[in-house]
């Protein structure tokens, strides 16, 4: 089974914020793959289905971003999923808005959701799709920026990044993630 987790914060107030771009990808995958996110266990909202002959579990942790590992570790234990079968999608301040970057491992890079995952999984070796949200300007605090909505200028770039992330997830069903990473990172 492949687990694809999108990081974000639960609740209407956070729905279209920069920090919730991981949730946006999961919602798009659920729609395209006809997987209903109808199970609410392990502090997460998730659903399972078969895509291209592979069993897939899509999940949105409902623990708030900084505690994402509290959802994923017990969920992965319950379904007996290894770390190499996990792909995590999340926002990244260090990438320009709308750019995506795939990685197979790495540090948290200051991202508290990833920090929580590394802590709970006991490793930094899991596949990631990072979606660029850019950095705040004019002295805006990072917390206000990541919890803010995309501007109308950013919206088309984010839609394109969500679409690319969906395509990367689809490609990873039939190819090794490293191959998908090389293909998609070359497009940046």
From Swiss-Prot:
Binding site for tRNA: 14, 64, 66, 112
Catalytic activity: an N-acyl-L-alpha-aminoacyl-tRNA + H2O = an N-acyl-L-amino acid + a tRNA + H(+)
CDD domains: PTH
One of the record's GO cellular component terms: cytoplasm
Effects seen without this gene: Cells no longer grow vegetatively, but are able to sporulate. In depletion studies cells are more sensitive tetracycline; a depletion mutant with an rqcH deletion is hypersensitive to tetracycline, suggesting this enzyme functions in the RQC pathway.
Site feature (Stabilizes the basic form of H active site to accept a proton) residues: 91
Keyword Hydrolase set for record: yes
EC primary class: hydrolase
Record keywords, A-Z: Cytoplasm, Hydrolase, RNA-binding, tRNA-binding
GO BP field: protein quality control for misfolded or incompletely synthesized proteins; rescue of stalled ribosome
Active site: 19
Localization per Swiss-Prot or TrEMBL: Cytoplasm
Cytoplasm as UniProt keyword: yes
One Gene Ontology term of the molecular function aspect: tRNA binding
EC nos: 3.1.1.29
Site (Discriminates between blocked and unblocked aminoacyl-tRNA): 9
Family the UniProt entry places it in: Belongs to the PTH family.
Quaternary data: Monomer.
PANTHER family in UniProt: PEPTIDYL-TRNA HYDROLASE
Function description: Hydrolyzes ribosome-free peptidyl-tRNAs (with 1 or more amino acids incorporated), which drop off the ribosome during protein synthesis, or as a result of ribosome stalling. Catalyzes the release of premature peptidyl moieties from peptidyl-tRNA molecules trapped in stalled 50S ribosomal subunits, and thus maintains levels of free tRNAs and 50S ribosomes. Releases Ala-tailed nascent peptides from stalled 50S ribosomal subunits. Non-templated Ala tailing occurs as part of the ribosome quality control (RQC) pathway. In the absence of Ala tails significantly less peptide release occurs.
Protein name as annotated: Peptidyl-tRNA hydrolase
Natural source organism: Bacillus subtilis (strain 168)
